[in-house]
């Protein structure tokens, strides 16, 4: 049986109540849920607007600045995947139970009959699942929104909805019914794959948020948006990697432990059809012929990673901590096929002084900045190989720039930008 949690993150007297309605937040199903949880927790406590925020340097404390009070945040989500985790377990919880699960027959068929070329779920079966579950979620949410509206009328509070991913169509439908302005985060190709289903949720949103102007441009080319807002992925570097000394020591030890320091080692993390599986099947043997010294280390699990193990210049390592990956590699490679959602691993590589080579699609150029090389979307294999060679030859300088650029997704900066978006859409 599916359960819906109402997670009370924080209450203040600011007169703003944020109502986040979505399928998953905690327990998180992936990075998108962790990102939104970080943003919501961030605006629930005191903090500055973007224009008042200091320049945040990863792993360093920030200077004191004027702070705004936190806002009230409620999260309406399914808990069918389990109980809350340390991500939000320090919050007060109110729990309500819903009678339907996250997955159903149609979502199961969509996955089992997924497209062999793209690796994406069967569109027809997935659409059938999404239509049904969004309809149910919307009806369930309406009961809570009605009481939230009554409470807001009595207190004079402003309401703002927030949603993302699979159940965002149902959440948006409920917000629209009660005249509640709302924000939608676009994280991946979902809305592009099901344009008719998600069009209303996006075009009627007070703002659509994405990580990177490039991604927002992709969204705006398909859906007429009222407002697009860049909110970077929030990464708490200190929580993930410790102190400056931890990161620098890890990198020094990793490089010192290498017995092949003259061999170019290129790291690839996570492989799916969207993240380059077909492309790597062409690139890896090409590089083996024209740059035989180079070696690729592929990290992650699943058939797509294993499918690259047959190339002589490639070693597959399975799931490995990011800090271990970037402790000893020379450069990092990431590509996408269609949707340019921000590659946060690019900036995590940068924190360790590792430059990246990526593709000119969506937000990838913004993620790389001047800390690596961007290859045109339709470039041939020779251009990719030359980019890898150039990045390797200039890895010291590009790595230094990548470390400087890592601050763009520091969670404190992202939270300040999200706080400013909320202020602007509500006209505070």
Predicted feature locations:
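A charged, aromatic-enriched C-terminal amphipathic alpha-helix characteristic of glycosyltransferases
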Residues: 245, 379, 393-426
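Acidic anion/phosphate-binding donor-loop and adjacent secondary structure
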Residues: 192-197, 234-263, 306-307, 412
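Conserved acidic donor-binding segment of nucleotide-sugar-dependent glycosyltransferases
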Residues: 269, 319, 370-381, 389-393
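Short acidic/histidine- and often glycine-rich active-site loop of Leloir-type glycosyltransferases
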Residues: 360-374
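Short hydrophobic beta-strand element within catalytic cores of glycosyltransferases
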Residues: 355-358
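Donor nucleotide-sugar binding/catalytic pocket of nucleotide-sugar-dependent glycosyltransferases
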Residues: 187, 191, 203-246
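A conserved mid-protein helix/loop that constitutes part of the nucleotide-sugar donor-binding site
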Residues: 34-38, 272-286, 340
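Conserved donor-binding/catalytic core segment of Leloir-type glycosyltransferases
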Residues: 21, 209, 256-275, 281-284
């Amino acid at each position: 049986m599916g359960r819906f949690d109402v997670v009370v993150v924080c209450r203040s007297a600011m007169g703003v109540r944020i109502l986040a309605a979505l399928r998953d937040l905690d327990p998180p199903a992936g990075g998108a849920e962790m990102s939104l949880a970080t943003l919501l927790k961030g605006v629930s406590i005191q903090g500055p607007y973007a224009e008042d925020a200091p320049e945040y340097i990863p792993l360093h404390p920030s200077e004191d600045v004027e702070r705004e009070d936190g806002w009230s945040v409620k999260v309406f989500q399914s808990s069918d995947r389990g109980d809350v985790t340390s991500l939000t377990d320090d919050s007060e919880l109110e729990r309500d139970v819903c009678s339907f699960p996250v997955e159903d027959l149609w979502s199961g068929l969509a996955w089992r009959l997924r497209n062999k070329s793209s690796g994406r779920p069967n569109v027809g079966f997935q659409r059938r699942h999404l239509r049904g579950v969004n309809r149910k979620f919307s009806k369930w949410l309406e009961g809570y929104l009605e009481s939230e509206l009554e409470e807001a009328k009595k207190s004079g509070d402003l309401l703002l909805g927030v949603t993302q991913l699979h159940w965002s169509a149902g959440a948006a439908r409920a917000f629209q019914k009660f005249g509640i302005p709302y924000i939608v985060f676009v994280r991946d190709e979902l809305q592009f794959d099901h344009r008719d289903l998600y069009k209303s949720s996006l075009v009627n949103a007070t703002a659509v948020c994405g990580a990177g102007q490039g991604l927002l441009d992709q969204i705006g080319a398909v859906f007429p948006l009222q407002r697009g807002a860049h909110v970077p992925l929030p990464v708490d570097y200190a929580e993930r990697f410790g102190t400056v000394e931890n990161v620098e020591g890890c990198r020094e030890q990793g490089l010192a432990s290498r017995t092949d320091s003259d061999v170019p080692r290129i790291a690839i993390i996570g492989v799916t059809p969207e993240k380059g599986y077909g492309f790597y099947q062409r690139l890896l043997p090409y590089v083996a012929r024209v740059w035989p010294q180079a070696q690729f280390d592929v990290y992650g699990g699943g058939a797509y990673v294993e499918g690259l193990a047959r190339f002589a210049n490639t070693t597959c390592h399975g799931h490995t901590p990011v800090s271990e990956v970037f402790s000893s590699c020379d450069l990092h490679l990431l590509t996408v096929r269609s949707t340019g959602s921000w590659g946060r691993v690019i900036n995590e590589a940068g924190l360790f002084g590792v430059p990246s080579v990526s593709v000119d699609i969506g937000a990838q150029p913004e993620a790389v900045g001047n800390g690596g090389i961007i290859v045109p979307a339709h470039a041939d294999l020779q251009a990719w190989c030359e980019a890898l060679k150039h990045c390797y030859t200039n890895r010291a300088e590009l790595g230094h720039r990548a470390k400087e650029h890592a601050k763009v997704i520091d969670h404190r900066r992202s939270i300040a930008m999200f706080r400013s978006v909320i202020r602007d859409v509500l006209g505070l």
